[in-house]
């Protein structure tokens, strides 16, 4: 087994303007970049961690530092799942291992994953929570978007006004909403009724993680997606009967390897599959784009919020996202 060189760096990603969700306002965020090399080839992975779990750069660096020798030993991607827990640190290393393995084999990652040649994916464009008129203006500005995701804050009347304003501005677009854990069970009936009136196609994570039992018996005509409730593979099966869609994010689950396993398990259980992101540059979107090839809903718009993305970067055309092999994952 060839020992690997392991480079771990941090970078600050600044947003072009503040971005608000339920309970948080983001102006910038830090990422960890892991580069693995064998003297001839290298692989890269970027992770932003999971802010609501305390999985920030300091935590990721600590996790990586404790496992550096095991990582340098050149584990397989499956072995890595036993070395590092789910989270940003494993995500960065796992994605680097994928790119390194593909480079060694002389094939792109999608081929290594057993997929057909990738296609552009229709992605959502996200609206941060703001005043309804401002959100409507932003929605009109997303001229190419065919799918829009609206961030809500748990303020029921204001949230429904936000959705109504966006729907009036974009009657042509598919709309989904994301509660980011901001609602309580007693609000759900009124929330769902209001969303139905605006032809909303997805309700994501309305209740807090840990309150999943409050969804028992709920019969929502709008599909419910679990995000914070479904972190890794172990959370997929318990979501049956409560959620209809699993939102997979590589920073949560620990990389493309686990993400693909989650998608496979969700399909086996009759659940829909969504790929999302915790923000990040195009380097973080590349692996998620591979996962997106097997998903029903794609939310990979993170780079559009950055003041400066990496180059080469993912492309957004006609409401679709495209991540070429030059961004991450090897030669075509």
Describe the predicted segments one by one.
Residues 303:
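Active-site cofactor/co-catalyst pockets and adjacent glycine-rich loops in catalytic enzymes
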